[in-house]
UniProtKB/Swiss-Prot annotation:
Glycans are attached at residues 18, 34, 178, 310, 497. This is Hemagglutinin. Residues 1-16 form the signal peptide. Binds to sialic acid-containing receptors on the cell surface, bringing about the attachment of the virus particle to the cell. This attachment induces virion internalization of about two third of the virus particles through clathrin-dependent endocytosis and about one third through a clathrin- and caveolin-independent pathway. Plays a major role in the determination of host range restriction and virulence. Class I viral fusion protein. Palmitoylated. In natural infection, inactive HA is matured into HA1 and HA2 outside the cell by one or more trypsin-like, arginine-specific endoprotease secreted by the bronchial epithelial cells. One identified protease that may be involved in this process is secreted in lungs by club cells. One of its GO terms (biological process) is fusion of virus membrane with host plasma membrane. InterPro entries: Capsid_hemagglutn, Hemagglutn_HA1_a/b_dom_sf, Hemagglutn_influenz_A, Hemagglutn_influenz_A/B. It is a single-pass type I membrane protein. Residues 17-527 are extracellular. It comes from Influenza A virus (strain A/Turkey/Minnesota/833/1980 H4N2). The gene is HA.
């Protein structure tokens, strides 16, 4: 009978862990069935409710002509445009933020080279405009406006229209030319001039009489002197001769002097340089469309608010930083702990310590309760807003840390500068590696902060409720409180909004707590009672067995013999 009584008490204790009939209020946070994995400082895989992708991987298949002004070189590169090659007349007076050079651009005039090609290309691109100022040059006793069959314009022999090919006069004279131009303006001037390299000595004397010729161009701070390199070269457009083009910048107040006895390709004027303009050049086959974007790459325009992109390392304009990662996710919600599918609303209710609540859609944090009036769920907007306020602006702050006009253009070097090109590539690769690492670290820091903030707000809400209830309720250890007094919906609401008065319910709660705890058995007493029950049961069983043996012996039913 004692064993049966003890077993009943144990069953009663086990059932007391379920709903006892007292009001219960639980605290929890929002959850979704499938969250998003993000990286933090301490964990590579943390599931959060919501996250935002920071790396743009999509681009438009076209270049946007707005708001940046684009000029399409079409069949002309920017140097041919400055020289005035046939087919480049559409570039006269052109103005741009980005000059689009096409891979299909071709030379259409006398074959030439530019010893310092990339520097000239960069100066022209940065200038942002072909603003050519024609000048009068008084050349002495030479023939001007030379033409070539390699340079057709409207099927007629012509030449670069920004340059003047000087040859000997009809009287076979090419006297020394010495001409000075003073820059009296308030801007720097760019002069482009050239030296012709005939293919034979005969061609040299036929054109210039003097052999060898010489060209010297000087300013107050520089001098370039070139002697023609006479010799046959591979035939290009019917010519085995070549022209080498040079350039000279004349600052305000400076002057330029042309001195030659032959082979000079003279300028017809100068280009006005704009020191305030910061334009650039992009080599791509992507067509120009009608879209709007501030960022261009060699693969197309990017229209995004994301701070990073992994589309192309060559980018121009207000562009996201290029990183090597294909994805970086910024946590914009709390840690996600999906609700167990088998758990009902109550009965096996649990708070935030065990799992989140998928039904909590009006806020990030909230309450569930059960009392005599039924059950209910409500969001806690104050703690939700406190968390949102700290998380909102994270993306903007991240963009501010990385948002600058970022121009990364492809650089080219002459073959003799291969070591410089290798070094430049190494520097660029190192910079990209550094940016990629910094981006990943920055996002991980922000994600760690987001999760810490949201966890902190949950703990603050729990502590606020615990301080309100005090001994009027018991912490169940799973985010729930069992309340030891009658608590209707208005009472529950006072707990939620922070107006709960502990003293009003104190006496009732103390009485109910003692009554309930009088029949509750703690886990320590359970073990003692189990051992006592087992011992008593064994003792009773042994006593009954001995009593039966004694009774049987007395009646002669059992005989015991002892042999020595």
């Amino acid at each position: 009978m004692l064993s049966i009584t003890i077993l009943f008490l144990l069953i009663a204790e086990g059932s007391s862990q379920n709903y006892t009939g007292n009001p219960v209020i639980c605290l929890g946070h929002h959850a979704v069935p499938n969250g998003t994995m993000v990286k933090t400082l301490t964990d590579d895989q943390v599931e959060v409710v919501t996250a935002q992708e920071l790396v743009e991987s999509q681009h438009l298949p076209e270049l946007c002509p707005s708001p940046l002004r684009l000029v399409d070189g079409q069949t002309c590169d920017i140097v041919n445009g400055a020289l005035g090659s046939p087919g480049c007349d559409h570039l006269n007076g052109a103005e741009w933020d980005v000059f689009i050079e096409r891979p299909t651009a071709v030379d259409t005039c006398y074959p030439f080279d530019v010893p310092d090609y990339q520097s000239l290309r960069s100066i022209l691109a940065n200038n942002g405009k072909f603003e050519f100022i024609a000048e009068e040059f008084q050349w002495n006793t030479v023939k001007q406006n030379g033409k070539s069959g390699a340079c057709k314009r409207a099927n007629v022999n012509d030449f670069f229209n920004r340059l003047n090919w000087l040859t000997k006069s009809d009287g076979n004279a090419y006297p020394l030319q010495n001409l000075t131009k003073v820059n009296n303006g308030d801007y720097a001037r760019l002069y482009i001039w050239g030296v012709h390299h005939p293919s034979t000595d005969t061609e040299q004397t036929n054109l210039y009489e003097n052999n060898p010729g010489r060209v010297t161009v000087s300013t107050q701070t520089s001098q370039t002197s070139v002697v023609p390199n006479i010799g046959s070269r591979p035939w290009v457009r019917g010519q085995s001769g070549r022209i080498s083009f040079y350039w000279t910048i004349v600052e305000p107040g400076d002057l330029i002097v042309f001195n030659t006895i032959g082979n000079l390709i003279a300028p017809r004027g100068h280009y006005k340089l704009n020191s305030q303009k910061k334009s650039t050049i992009l080599n791509t086959a992507v067509p120009i469309g009608s879209c709007v974007s501030k960022c261009h790459t060699d693969r197309g325009s990017i229209s995004t608010t994301k701070p990073f992109q992994n589309i192309s390392r060559i980018s121009i304009g207000d562009c996201p930083k290029y990183v090597k990662q294909g994805s970086l996710k910024l946590a914009t919600g709390m840690r996600n702990i999906p609700e167990k599918a088998t758990r009902g609303l109550f009965g096996a209710i649990a708070g935030f310590i065990e799992n989140g609540w998928q039904g909590l859609i009006d806020g990030w944090y909230g309450f569930r309760h059960q009392n005599a009036e039924g059950t209910g769920t409500a969001a806690d907007l104050k703690s939700t807003q406190a968390a949102i306020d700290q998380i909102n602006g994270k993306l903007n702050r991240l963009i501010e840390k990385t948002n600058e006009k970022y121009h990364q253009i492809e650089k080219e070097f002459e073959q003799v500068e291969g070591r410089i090109q290798d070094l430049e590539k190494y520097v660029e690769d190192t910079k990209i590696d550094l940016w990629s690492y910094n981006a990943e670290l920055l996002v991980a820091l922000e994600n760690q902060h987001t999760i810490d903030v949201t966890d902190s707000e949950m703990n603050k809400l729990f502590e606020r409720v615990r301080r309100q209830l005090r001994e009027n309720a018991e912490d169940k250890g799973n985010g729930c409180f069992e309340i030891f007094h009658q608590c209707d919906n208005s009472c529950i609401e006072s707990i939620r909004n922070g107006t709960y008065d502990h003293d009003i319910y104190r006496d009732e709660a103390i009485n109910n707590r003692f009554q309930i705890q009088g029949v509750k058995l703690t886990q320590g007493y359970k073990d003692i009672i189990l051992w006592i029950s087992f011992s008593i049961s064994c003792f009773l069983l042994v006593a009954l067995l001995l009593a039966f043996i004694l009774w049987a012996c007395q009646n002669g039913n059992i005989r015991c013999q002892i042999c020595i």
